[in-house]
Amino acid sequence: MTAPKSTAPASTAATFRAIPVDDLSPAEAASEHKALAQEITGHDAAYYREDAPVVSDAEYDALRHRYEAIEERFPGLRGEDSLSEKVGAAPSEKFGKVAHKVPMLSLANCFSDEEVVEFVARVKRFLNLGPDDEVAFTCEPKIDGLSCSLHYENGRLTVAATRGDGSQGEDVTQNVRTIADIPERLAGKGVPQTIDVRGEVYMAKADFEALNARQAAAEEKVFANPRNAAAGSLRQLDSSITASRPLKFFAYAWGEASDLPAETQFGVVEAFARWGFTTNPLMVVAKDAAGLIAHYRSIEAQRALLGYDIDGVVYKVNSLELQRRLGFVSRSPRWAIAHKFPAEQATTVLEDIEIQVGRTGALTPVAKLTPVTVGGVVVSSATLHNEDEIARKDVRIGDTVVVQRAGDVIPQVVRVIEEKRPAGSKPYEFPTHCPACGSHAVREVDTKSGKVDAVRRCTGGLICPAQMVERLRHFVSRNAFDIEGLGEKQVRAFYEWGLIASPADIFTLETRNARSLQRLENRDGWGKTSAANLFAAIAERRTVAVDRFVFALGIRHVGETNAKRLMRHYGTVEALEAGALAAVIPGEEHPKGNEAWQEMIGIDGIGDVVAEAVIEFFGEPRNREVVTALLKEVTPEPMEQVAAASPVSGKTVVFTGSLEKMTRDEAKAMAERLGAKVAGSVSAKTNLVVAGPGAGSKLEKAQALGVQVITEDEWFELVG
């Protein structure tokens, strides 16, 4: 199964992700990718191990969809531990573990007729078949239960296991033996010597209602839905409890098998029925996408009358030979897909539109709703995506709206019921100032393409409380002010204690602490020595390289490299600020091209996007106040000038392996001071590779490309 039905009125999955994946910066993508991984892992554990899911099927699918879309857009985030390569959750320690010789994979999902047509076309393309060539598919209901694998040796049930993480499941053999639908011995012809029969343990709706009535009468826990009841019943340590629960089983797949009784999916499932299993009577064979969709509609129409929960229809290539040719991709087979039913919708009143400010300054509109139940979950908030979506749908406060829990971001406002709009309502005006700090909020424009960013962002990064902890954490980070002993944990605590609210506060902390009634050394986790060490570390950073100073300000799009480029040109923070202010055109939200603007974009490597971000930053008066206050406490050191006559000036250099005479940061600084560009990877554009002991793939690639390779000693000889 892919996801649970919710048992809670709210969940972390309702965190609204309104920024389209294509608009995420690499840093934003990495941060969200990590957060999504943690969230999905938690939901997997709740669903597969604890039988206590807290998000709906649609919510979970949307989280997975977002996670995979980020990996597709930013392939570098897909590591060996990516959730894209995993299924389910690790088995519980309460049960013995069973290894699946053939992994129990999940299925890819689709939600529209167009996606079904594309699935069929994709299968044919992979098989080098023409559009008119015929491929048969099976169609069957997608049961909302708990996946289980039953291992038979010489026709006898020997081991039963849950899906677990797909590679290893929980041993539930004794509990499975109590389910009447699961034969202890396989009867009939064609039973192989060994076979794993796979299917779904579920509970019929009538049995679920009767069980809950008994539970309530005995003043015991009642279950939220049939799926939870089935999973909780199967995963009992006492098999007598499982025996008392009305569990059922549909057989529909297999894993390891010494032989198979047929060459088609449908034929093998027919054999399951002959051997004593219950199979789904609604399974049919279709020969094209139109047939698949027609059967989907038929099952959807019968859904309420089936007597058990389903959440879609599964399509599988019928020929086992074609299945073998198609193979697998990531965590699912190419030859199968689950066509999910649309999420349920409900109508309610939009009471207000709240603007939330994210840690990067993004303004996200959230609809505050009269609470309404959608698919068994109480919804009181929904995303409105961004101001363009609000305008496109003409969403207004007081409107009656349709809310849905499905799609890219959920829950969401689908549409307005205009005939119920109250008299005198006015179009919503999206704020142009941050509700958290009052700073100007802007939408970036690519001056070359004219494309306007969908997201409006606060420009008051250094004074905005919604962004402050993240901004302060960045300010003290290693490549910025690099203050030892002042990490994210300490920054967050100091901010919550009211000790630090802006960068300049860091440098007045010791003075203020001496006058405070509650000194730092008397707070939990601190003492005289640790406080003294922190104050000493802060004092050491009262002088800092000017490019580090600018990088530490956290100006959007200004990383270490761009900070260096800007400060090599402007020299001082004051000159950079003056240049930015000179480029501001009164009454215009975006620069149009005066001399100051042309000067900034004329800097090598500084384009329109970076220049506009710098101008917007210094265009906010309170940002300038913060910078002025900081300059009273800190002295930025001028950048060392590039050596124009250096033998490596203008060349791209890569350092690899262990450096023995300098750190990697020192090597980078030296090379840049000599006018070189330092890259992190080797390419055809690389001019020189400096290789120390232990150099690996970068050295090999350099040799393959014919790039000059030298040792660390030869580097010092070269640059003098």
UniProtKB/Swiss-Prot annotation:
Task: Report whether GTP-binding shows up as a keyword of the record.
Answer: no
Keyword annotations: DNA damage, DNA repair, DNA replication, Ligase, Magnesium, Manganese, Metal-binding, NAD, Zinc
Q: Which residues form the BRCT domain?
A: 643-720
**GO terms of molecular function:** DNA ligase (NAD+) activity; metal ion binding
* Signal peptide coordinates: none
SMART domains per the UniProt record, alphabetical: BRCT, LIGANc
Q: Which residues bind Zn(2+)?
A: 434, 437, 458, 464
Cellular component (GO) terms are: cytosol
This protein's source sits in the domain of life called Bacteria
Q: Look up the record and name the cofactor or cofactors this protein needs.
A: Mg(2+); Mn(2+)
Q: Which terms under GO biological process does the entry name?
A: DNA repair; DNA replication
Q: What is its EC number?
A: 6.5.1.2
Listed binding positions for NAD(+) are 57-61, 106-107, 140, 163, 200, 316, 340
Q: Name one Pfam family in it.
A: BRCT
Alphabetized InterPro entries for the sequence:
BRCT_dom (IPR001357), BRCT_dom_sf (IPR036420), DisA/LigA_HHH (IPR041663), DNA_ligase (IPR001679), DNA_ligase_AS (IPR018239), DNA_ligase_CS (IPR033136), DNAligase_adenylation (IPR013839), DNAligase_N (IPR013840)
Q: Which reaction does it catalyse?
A: NAD(+) + (deoxyribonucleotide)n-3'-hydroxyl + 5'-phospho-(deoxyribonucleotide)m = (deoxyribonucleotide)n+m + AMP + beta-nicotinamide D-nucleotide
Q: Which family does it belong to?
A: Belongs to the NAD-dependent DNA ligase family. LigA subfamily.
Q: What does this protein do?
A: DNA ligase that catalyzes the formation of phosphodiester linkages between 5'-phosphoryl and 3'-hydroxyl groups in double-stranded DNA using NAD as a coenzyme and as the energy source for the reaction. It is essential for DNA replication and repair of damaged DNA.
Which HAMAP family does the record associate with it?
DNA_ligase_A
Question: Under what name is this protein listed?
Answer: DNA ligase
- What organism is the protein native to? Xanthobacter autotrophicus (strain ATCC BAA-1158 / Py2)
Query: Which gene name belongs to this protein?
Result: ligA
